[in-house]
């Protein structure tokens, strides 16, 4: 069941009496509680099992994929047979709290260059400080070679909170890489550090000449946007080529944003969320000069993983956004017309645990990772 909404209108779902949906200045606002029932007729098939806290996946040529496990393992898996092979020679990883081995991206020209990209929390000293890190490497057989550190966020800090992170390559070959604010919320408003930012780099790690802060020095040269909290979803729009990002709010205020060069996305100056246990954060949800979210969830759903659907298996979903939820253990479809939100659908809930990542294969198959000790990869099939 999909709830359609109109601009400046208010409509309440009959099945969800606590789900008002309204627009204000073109912004979609949600307050909801999800019961335990299915909204879409789909089946879930586990294709790979016995993965420990899988965090991200990307597709290799053929029927294989790479999957990260947060404790620090990278697996090559066969999506048809379920066979797993652990990749060797990984860098040192700080697997503490929310940190560990995080995102993986396979280069679009992998057949020619065997290149992949990994994001993870890396230790920086013996005292336990760590920072969000991006590397490239070549996958030769079942081991990594030619590893190059492309970026490390500054400063490195103790603790295990809010590392981010996702990485995607835009159509022009630029890398976009999200960095959490490590729980130092005020630092996200200071682009002189990397906390709470999205980084933009050439694939060799060099700073593009058109990065927004390269010449004016109002921020670090690597930064593309700032004012983010903990972005754990990133996707490339298949038509516009723009990068979409979602991030965790505090108690409420999870957001989806479309990135803009040099933009301030507000955290913690503006947010629809509040302190855990109650209490205001910042000056409110809006302020001049700060980008408003395309969509936000209040209360939070704890979004993680995101991809645009393109394919023939679910033809009615083409151009829509699929988002995982850790808190409500569900998959959400955001119905889009271009870049305008029309409504949402709960595809399923409470069937595989916490949904950590969502990926759509080149063939239009939808794969999901569950953030569980005995996790795995699941394929979504129509009934």
Please give the residue ranges for each predicted region.
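Bacterial N-terminal signal peptides
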Residues: 20-36
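Acidic, Gly/Ser/Thr-rich repeat motifs that build Ca2+-stabilized beta-propeller blades
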Residues: 38-185, 233-236, 241-249, 299-337, ...
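Beta-strand initiation motifs
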Residues: 39-43, 81-86, 139-148, 206-219, ...
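Surface-exposed loop and turn segments in beta-propeller and other repeat-based domains
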Residues: 87-99, 147-160, 203-224, 268-297
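Beta-propeller blade signature
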Residues: 132-141, 192-203, 259-260
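Repeat-solenoid scaffold signature
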Residues: 219-258
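Conserved blade-ending motifs and adjacent loop-strand segments that build the rim/top face
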Residues: 342-362
């Amino acid at each position: 069941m999909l709830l359609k909404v109109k601009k400046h209108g208010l409509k309440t779902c009959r099945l969800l009496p606590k789900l008002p949906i309204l627009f204000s200045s073109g912004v979609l606002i949600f307050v909801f509680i999800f019961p335990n029932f299915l909204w879409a007729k789909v089946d879930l098939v586990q294709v790979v099992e016995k993965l420990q806290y899988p965090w991200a996946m990307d597709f290799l040529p053929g029927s294989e994929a790479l999957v990260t496990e947060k404790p620090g393992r990278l697996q090559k898996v066969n999506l048809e047979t379920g066979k797993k092979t652990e990749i060797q020679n990984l860098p040192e990883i700080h697997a503490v709290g929310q940190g560990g081995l995080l995102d993986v991206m396979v280069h679009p020209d992998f057949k020619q260059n065997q290149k992949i990209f990994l994001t993870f929390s890396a230790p920086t000293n013996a005292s336990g400080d760590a920072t969000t890190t991006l590397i490239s490497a070549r996958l030769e057989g079942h081991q990594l070679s030619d590893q190059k550190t492309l970026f490390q966020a500054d400063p490195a800090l103790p603790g295990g909170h809010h590392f981010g992170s996702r990485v995607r390559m835009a159509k022009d070959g630029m890398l976009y890489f999200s960095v959490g604010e490590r729980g130092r919320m005020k630092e996200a408003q200071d682009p002189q550090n990397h906390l709470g930012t999205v980084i933009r780099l050439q694939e060799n790690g060099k700073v593009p000449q058109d990065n927004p802060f390269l010449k004016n020095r109002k921020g670090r040269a690597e930064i593309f946007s700032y004012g983010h909290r903990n972005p754990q979803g990133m996707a490339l729009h298949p038509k516009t080529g723009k990068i979409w990002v979602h991030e965790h709010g505090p108690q409420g205020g999870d957001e989806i944003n479309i990135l803009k060069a040099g933009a301030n996305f507000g955290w913690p100056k503006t947010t629809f969320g509040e302190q855990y246990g109650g209490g205001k954060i910042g000056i409110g949800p809006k302020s001049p000069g700060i980008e408003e979210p395309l969509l936000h969830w209040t209360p939070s759903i704890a979004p993680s993983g995101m991809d645009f659907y393109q394919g023939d298996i679910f033809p009615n979903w083409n151009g829509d956004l699929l988002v995982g939820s850790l808190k409500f253990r569900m998959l959400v479809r955001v119905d889009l017309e271009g870049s305008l939100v029309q409504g949402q659908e709960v595809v399923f809930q409470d069937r595989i645990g916490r949904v950590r990542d969502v990926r759509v294969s080149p063939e239009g198959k939808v794969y999901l990772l569950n953030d569980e000790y005995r996790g795995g990869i699941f394929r979504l099939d129509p009934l």
